[in-house]
Amino acid sequence: MKNLFLFMAITLVGLGGCSEKRSQPLAIDNSLTQEEIAAGVLSPEVMWKMGRVGLASLSPDASRLLYTVTWYNMQENRGVTAIYVRDAASGEVAQLTDFSSNNSDPKWNADGSKIYFLSDRSGSSQIWEMGADGQNPRQLSKLEKDIEGFGVNPAGDKVFYVQGVQVADRKSSDIHPDMAESKARVYDDLMCRHWDRWDEGEYRHIFIADLTSGGIGKGVDIIGEGAEWDTPLAPYFDMSEIAWAPDGTRLAYTC
């Protein structure tokens, strides 16, 4: 019994240390060494020091540009995505989020006073908002599953978001509970695999919810319960395939 308690204590300490490490900002060093500069070669090591520029969003008055950059730390074998804003007139750049969590998909509100974005700082990918200067971040959604993309209507009172929905059982262990250790998959139609991705019976669906001062309310699956198709379309799941109408009362999407 004493050994059991000792094992549990060591495990908890280890998990706590891992969690603390993940909450610390990821160290990013993108400076080139003297050897790399002298060689003048675009080596794999040099390429990994380069930031990957992601989604961009122009402010309503066209004076500021939001965009993301993903940086990598080779020693820790992980990366982090941060949000930046650039002043169109001066070219001045400010980093709005730090390297302690992934922050992506930034969008301006209608008057340019707030920024909506996705962040995993709460432990899963959820919708957040912050001031145009990056101050006062606030979590808007608190859903059980990750949100993969979203869009706020022009009026700022509705939001669509995309989540994976388990629609069908593909694993034999799900179909036959008495075969819990079975690793087989069961299919009766194509396609069961695309590139390196198996069809696991989960599909991306669009949900629409109210957006109030209290956050995001319960969403409604507009694709339909049990619908075995993705929107946006696989394999890229591009959020540009979903758009609010200018009056904010209708949603256009592909499926």
Region spans (language model):
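Sec-dependent N-terminal signal peptides
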Residues: L4-L12
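Short glycine/acidic-enriched loop and turn motifs that connect beta-strands
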Residues: W71-Q75, R121-S124, Q166-D169
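Predominantly five- to eight-bladed beta-propeller fold
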Residues: Q24-D29, T81, G164-G214, G219, ...
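Multi-bladed beta-propeller domains
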Residues: L26-R52, R78, R86-N102, M130-D146, ...
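C-terminal motif of bacterial Sec signal peptides marking the signal peptidase cleavage site
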Residues: L15-G17
